[in-house]
Amino acid sequence: MLEPVWCCRLKLLTLYGVNRIDMAQPVQQIDLAHEFERRKPWVTKFLIDGREYGGHFDAMNDGRISQFFQYFPNASTILELGALEGGHSFSLANQPAVKRVVAAEGRPSNIEKALFVQTLIGSQKVEFVEANLEDFDLLALGNFDAVFCSGLLYHVPEPWTLIERCAQLSSNLFIWTHYAGEDEVEKVVHGLRGKWHREGGLGDPLSGLSKKSFWPTLGSLINMLTKNGYRTVHLIENALKHPNGLAVTLAATKA
C-alpha cells in the first residue's frame, strides 16, 4: 500500500537531512550561500531575501506557468511530473486558487534540494514524492484538476504509457516537450512515428533515468492525447528553432 503523501514527505525530510540545519533560526542568520554550495550542482535559481542562490534557470518566473493557468485557471489541485528542484512546484503553488501541488521527481538529490528550499520559503501547499515516472503508479496519488508536465515527456522511453496514466487521473493536461520532426523519423513504436534519443544517465540532472527515450512526432503526440480522451488539444507554441530540438507547448482537455 502506498503511504500518504504527507507521510512520505516527513520521511523524506529525515532521510535527506534537511533538518541538519536549524530551521528555528531566522533565515537571515543561516549561511545560505554555504548551504546552497554544499548541495550543488543546482539548475534552478531561487530568490531569497533579495539574493539569488542556486543555478541559472528562473523556474519561478517561467512563462509556462502563466500559460498553464491561462488554460486551466480554476485548477486547485495539480500534479507536477518532473519537479527537478521545485522551482515550478513553488510557482504553481503561489497562485491563490491553488490548494495542493503534488510534485513527483525521480532523483532523490533533487528532492533533497527542493525540501531544503521549501524550509526556507515556507511553501506548505507542495508535497514532494520520489517517483520513477516510467513505472510509478500515479493513480495511487488520487485525482487532480490538472497535470503539469513540463520538460519530462521527452525523457521517458514509453511516453504513451505516461499519457495514458495522466488521462486516468485528470481531464486537463499541460505539456511542454521536445518532439521528432517528420524528417527525423526512424521508427514506428507502439503505432507512433518518431525516433529514439540517447539520455545522459543518472549523472546528468537534466536527463532521463533510462538510457534512451522515445520522441514521437507532433502528429503522433496529438494522436496519443486524443486516443486517451483529450478531445481538445490547444497548440500554444511550436518552437521550431529551439537549440535542443523541436519543442511544443500543448494544453489538452477532455471537455
What kind of region is each of these model predictions?
Residues 75-84:
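Conserved class I S-adenosyl-L-methionine
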